[in-house]
Amino acid sequence: MSVVVYAPASIGNVSVGFDVLGAAVSPIDGTLLGDRVLVELGSEAFTLATAGSFVDKLPENPKDNIVYDCWCVFSRELNKKNVALKNVHMILEKNMPIGSGLGSSACSIVAALDALNQFHDNPLNDMELLALMGEMEGQISGGIHYDNVAPCYLGGLQLMVEELGIISQEVPCFDEWYWVMAYPGIKVSTAEAREILPSQYRRQDVIAHGRNLAGFIHACYSKQPELAAKMIKDVVAEPYRERLLPNFAKAREYAASAGALTTGISGSGPTLFSICKDKDVADRVSRWLQENYVQNNEGFVHVCRLDKQGSQVTGSKL
């Protein structure tokens, strides 16, 4: 018996919701922009192999890999429930660049924990599993946050509420939007990107942030795409982080001139996203970003839609 789970890329913050909004995305051409994890019966308690486009960026020692930590916390939770743990052999297919702003660590965490749960006949419910995912994300970035793992696992546009036992809930978004994702091929550390943020904010910035986020959520629920796009502004992180992203200002300027609704930093960067309301504009922006924002062979641009499914079982073989 074996199971393979695919976990998609995600946009943390979506500019307007620092640490409280996240969106899962998938390329419209069918490319798998995300990680896959296989779990099968093993001869020992835990063994791990690695594969994929970015396998050379992973630690050599399996016990230094986040997938091992996922297995440890999953084992801990099963012990609490008196559920027997099976011996597992796991394979992480690492297709997501590390430090990309695409929720790379979330992809590995979500795929690993979802696959382990599926392999053991789902002893943990969605919120229990999501809590573990946030714990693992915190281990990497220095603080528990769900804005990548929640959309990666549950799909769609997710708002972190963290009340009444609910970690996140889906917010209705706009099916007609194209999300152009451009990764330049360089790395930005999440921890480094957090360190450059100020420890305190001016009152007018706090007010603007509250207005933008409330306005965006209102526009999503009242089905006003133009207003929603206008409210996607970042006064919390982007003014400080954009200097970490070469050509970001030029890219945003070009995208606006080409007809994009808005452009922002995905997570802590260096990936950016541009939202477009029609395919022609998305293709035009995509071509420009490929020629002017991508810096090396590891970079890429994808035209995406919101991924409403999140992580999913794709079969039993990689």
UniProtKB/Swiss-Prot annotation:
Enzyme class label: transferase
Gene3D superfamilies reported in the protein's UniProt record: 3.30.230.10, GHMP kinase, C-terminal domain (3.30.70.890)
Enzyme Commission number, as recorded: 2.7.1.39
One GO term (biological process): threonine biosynthetic process
Subcellular location: Cytoplasm
Keywords, in A-Z order: Amino-acid biosynthesis, ATP-binding, Cytoplasm, Kinase, Nucleotide-binding, Threonine biosynthesis, Transferase
PROSITE patterns: GHMP_KINASES_ATP
GO MF term list: ATP binding; homoserine kinase activity
SUPFAM superfamilies linked: GHMP Kinase, C-terminal domain, Ribosomal protein S5 domain 2-like
Pathway(s): Amino-acid biosynthesis; L-threonine biosynthesis; L-threonine from L-aspartate: step 4/5
Pfam family, one: GHMP_kinases_C
Binding site for ATP: 97-107
Function: Catalyzes the ATP-dependent phosphorylation of L-homoserine to L-homoserine phosphate.
Identification of the protein by name: Homoserine kinase
Naturally occurring in which organism (per UniProt): Aliivibrio fischeri (strain ATCC 700601 / ES114) (Vibrio fischeri)
Gene field: thrB
